[in-house]
Amino acid sequence: MSGTTMVILSAFVAYLLLMIVIGVVYMKKTSSSEDYFLGGRGLNAWVAALSAQASDMSGWLLMGLPGAIYSLGTGQIWIAVGLFIGTVLNWVCISHRLRKYTIAANNSLTIPAFLENRFQDKKRILLLLSSIVIVIFFLVYTASALAAGGKLFNTVFGIDYHVALAIGAAVILCYTFMGGFMAVCVTDFVQGTLMLIGLLVVPLVAYLTLSGSLSDLLTQSGAPGGAAAFLNPFENGERPYTFIEIFSQLAWGLGYCGMPHILTRFMAVKSEKELKKSSVIAIVWDILSLTAACFIGIIGRAYLLPTVLGENGASSSESVFIEMINKLFSSHLGLPFIGGIFLCGILAAIMSTADSQLLVTASAASEDLYHQFIKKDADSKEILTVARLTVIVVSVLAFVIAWNPNSSIMGLVSNAWAGLGAAFGPTVVMSLFWRRTNLAGAVAGIVSGGLTVIVWDYIPLAAGQTLGSYTGLYSLAVGFAVSLVMIIIFSLATKAPSKEITDVFDKVAGK
């Protein structure tokens, strides 16, 4: 291992040790399941905002999105536009009412518990169904984060992908196991800050060191359709984007209102005043980070010449940010330790999502399944033990799913995002804003949304292709629409909610 690599490694080791120390500190402060899952509802504005956005964006922000733009051009920015719109609507429209409603609904600690309490589901159908959906789709989502970590260590240090996968999984498991929600949120705050600094600094410095015009360098790199097409958001190589392609990318924004690991941040903020501050901080962070990630894909295509990623044995396009940092700080500026810190920003993005996903899955398994169905008289410490064991089991299963080094980060994230967004998004929105929504409608929404995504993405029904591949339409858009329609139909076709349920709704709505 070269001297430069050793310096970068020292930055990684220092960073990983800091995360573990945070886990140890908060392990001592975590004595109950409410502490472990929601931090005692004590998050301040900055921690809530940055932890929500960091856990949202994941390695996809620093690897998947820049890689897609690097390969296909700025037409991929419509995903970023959709995500920004979704973020704004989630913070402005969903966060305040969800926080109030989860407190009014028997102080619900998780999204499945909230849905059960919201509709007074005595048969526990919603709790069981929601928990199963979370475990299934979060396994895939967590696997995407672990795969990103494996690719990071493999690219930077030349470590075998599978060994790298194990290292990343072990560290994330360690501090999530120990500290629970507060450890995850504090580490996510650190990680969200580091991500944003890296996103802003690296493309700017790389642009200033370009040895020619951006347009000329893009043409030399073999950009699809030439520089003009590459920089045109309405072009896909040598042809215009279709309406369906743009709509499908914008539809990513629909997923936000169905993401349990993001929604729990709203539930955990300590006051309405702090939540308002969080909204502003989160939206500003989102604008800056998404814009910078898009520029990484564009500038990276020119900056890395003569290397063209994805060709002639070079790294995949999803490694564009990693390769930029290595070239900029190790080769051009001779500052490998600083480069190592920025590479930790990528690791931060990966870890911030994986830890949140592990925690949500643990809460679904321990609080919503074990406590409610297996041992109802379990005390808080026993639930905490089950949660920690769940973190271990889920980590191992996600590790197995991520074992293939050719796994696409973008593909894994896309499928998991669609499944969770379609299953929970419409149900959460309607439960918060439509008084007539009832138990039958909520069940129909979750089942139809989740199944639509599975059928659309995995079952070849059209000339040997899946409907997603055949139509080019993102499964989240279809699943969200189907779920919304089913909620309305089943709610209107069955008995209206009781007065007790509507009284709580009216209280939360301020009527």
Question: Which residues fall in each region the model found?
Answer:
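Membrane-embedded helix-loop-helix hairpins and adjacent transmembrane boundary segments
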Residues: 1-511
